[in-house]
Amino acid sequence: MEKIRVVELFAGVGGFRLGLEQASANFQTVLANQWEPSMQAQFAFDCYERHFGHRPEHVCQNIVTAKEGIPPHGLLVGGFPCQDYSIAKKGARGIEGKKGILWWEINAILQTHRPRYVLLENVDRLIKSPAWQKGRDFSIILRCFYEAGYAVEWRVINAADYGEAQRRRRTFLFAFRNDTALFREASEKICISGLKGAHQLLLQDGFFAPIFPLYGFERKYSEGWLDEFRYLDLKDLSARQSCHFYDSGLMVNGRFYSVESIPVQFPPCPLGSVLENHELDERYFLSAANIERWQYLKGSKHELRHRKNGTPYFFSEGAMAFPDSLDLPSRTMLTSEGTVSRSSHVVVDPWTQRLRTLTPIECERLNGFPDNWTAGMPERMRYFTMGNALVVPLVKAMGKRISALTEDEQRS
């Protein structure tokens, strides 16, 4: 079998590459790009090179510059920046935001190189972005793929549903070019059977279903034609235009189908299974001085606050588990993990029975990385990079599927 030439964008600490290489020796990374514009020290890129070597095809540049040197490839992968789509960021501007606009660099690569397959990852909110015009950004992304000659299948996957130790919901998009066997099969099914054919692809015969099976669908669904959306130009969708996309869907020949799916849930992997069971440094344990702060952050609130202009308002939020249950998968890790914050996990240490935060190694395990994958960078950045990372075993499963599809095509 010929090697599958891979270009990895927004590579981070290498989660996509690690998963693909665990899946098959048939993947060959011909370019990897990682650059964090807000930081002088490039900790994620340095981590990437510690594991995959100092090579000329590893590029630490702005994607605007780096895309000019992209070689021919068959698979484009990347977890493109999510801050402008994330519910964790107030006022996220979606595809118009500072990092959201990087989508247009991906689109330029699609137009120029037209790789056979594309696998992208983003936050689950991508399909509903922006908040004031739900579905606008995702419809633009689908339109870009359509105009570049691709079909797209997407799925919002909760890693915990498929046996991982973290409840991390992420949108995965798999695009396949219009000269592939998968495209021909999808086109034929939809042409002959319409909505029934789309359901069969999403439930059984498409890209995701064989590796992340579904029980079925809820009654929520939407369908339509991308040509019906009113674009002043591709970046400027009518301000009145919105579309409801659900967590599973398919776009073929400009027509989209989207449904709310019910996953087959694998046996759960509890948070307790990733904890280090030995004596840890005192810095991870909650001190008597800050326990009250933790209790406040994790507790329910209904309190009077004031906006910057002095306007009063009542702020309310419910209580969170404190400490986190060791018998359930963890909550989603954020980049602020390990700090004194509402979102950070607090667990009962199995060695001492005292309350503590998660260690960097435990965060790596929650994302399926080997222990100490991020060792060598400041500890704050170890948490930060894991808060940005994807769950490697999910990519491994998708890598096996892509390798099998490619092998079938090369045989035929």
Predicted regions and their residues:
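Extracellular structured ligand-interaction cores
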Residues: K3, R168-R170, L328-S330
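Short, flexible loop/turn segments with low-complexity composition
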Residues: N62, S187-I190, D408-S412
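C-terminal target-recognition/interaction regions appended to catalytic cores
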Residues: Q241-S412
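Class I S-adenosyl-L-methionine
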Residues: A66-H73, I87-M320
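Short, solvent-exposed loop/turn segments at secondary-structure junctions
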Residues: G14, P81-Y85, D124-R125, A160-Y162, ...
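Proline-centered helix-kink/hinge sites
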Residues: F80-P81, P115, A165, P370-D371, ...
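Core alpha/beta nucleotide-donor-binding catalytic domains of modification enzymes
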Residues: E2-Y117, V123-F138, Y146
